[in-house]
Swiss-Prot record:
Gene Ontology molecular-function annotations: proton-transporting ATP synthase activity, rotational mechanism
Stored InterPro entries: ATP_syn_F0_a_bact/chloroplast, ATP_synth_F0_asu, ATP_synth_F0_asu_AS, F0_ATP_A_sf
Taxonomic lineage: Bacteria, Bacillati, Bacillota, Bacilli, Lactobacillales
Designated gene of the protein: atpB
Protein name, as recorded: ATP synthase subunit a
SUPFAM superfamilies: F1F0 ATP synthase subunit A
Length: 238
């Protein structure tokens, strides 16, 4: 059997996984389309799609209120909402269909089922919270937090690294495992024709459970982002 080849694009020293890039673009398009559709023709008394959008915004605002000072919460509400919606859509993207090449390579997976993507997303969050910490509190005050108390400086730096790593691995582990189990259930249906009804029912139940877990992971990711951000920008953390 011919070995499956992953579509790649090389631009100078950087190599892009075209499959991952494509599903990321699809994720962004879905998020944009949903917000654009739900925010059209908004009314003073919300109903239908507007109610759903406002509920999501209020839900994410509640996360920010728990971890950010009141005067800062509104400044980051849109960021947290975007992160939550993006991760929620990305987590669920690979659950509902499968697109394989003749070599057996799956072209349609959740972006968050790719460890490199999760590490990049986690790195973005880590850099963002530190940049915001410097912008809000100043470089000296920001570095002072990492060195207070000074004997704990190595542990504080280690904590920053473990926060970055755990944010990515937690997301990857849950989403990747969900897609693996979904693939095994589909293989069960292909094994024998009389297994198909059982596999169908099991797959429906597992998909519903996976959607729930994916949304929980989006919530956890957003909550941890708000937590890390609050530690860097809140005046109460002085």
């Amino acid at each position: 059997m011919e070995e499956a080849k992953i579509p790649m694009l090389k631009l100078g020293p950087i190599t892009f996984n075209l499959t991952l890039l494509a599903v990321c673009i699809v994720t962004i398009a879905i998020v944009f389309a949903f917000v654009f559709w739900a925010s059209r023709q908004m009314k003073l008394k919300p109903e239908g799609k507007q109610t759903a959008l406002e509920y999501l915004i209020s839900f994410v605002d509640g996360i920010g209120e728990e971890h950010l000072d009141h005067n800062l919460q509104k400044s980051y509400s849109l960021l947290l909402f975007t992160i939550f919606l993006f991760v929620a859509v990305a987590n669920n993207l690979g659950l509902f269909t499968k697109l394989e090449t003749v070599n057996g390579y799956n072209l349609w997976t959740s972006p968050t089922a790719n460890l490199a993507f999760d590490l990049a997303l986690s790195l973005f969050i880590t850099l963002m919270v530190h940049i915001e910490g410097v912008r809000r509190r100043g470089l000296v005050a920001h570095l002072k937090r990492l060195a207070t108390p000074w004997p704990m400086t190595p542990m504080n730096l280690l904590e920053e690294f473990t926060n970055f790593l755990s944010l990515a691995i937690r997301l990857f582990g849950n989403i990747f495992a969900g897609e693996v189990v979904t693939g095994l259930i589909v293989q069960l249906a292909n094994y024998r024709v009389y297994w198909w009804p059982i596999a169908f029912l099991v797959n429906m139940a597992w998909t519903a459970f996976s959607v729930f877990i994916s949304c929980i992971q989006a919530f956890v990711f957003t909550k941890l982002t708000a937590t890390y951000l609050g530690k860097k920008v809140n005046e109460s953390e002085e």
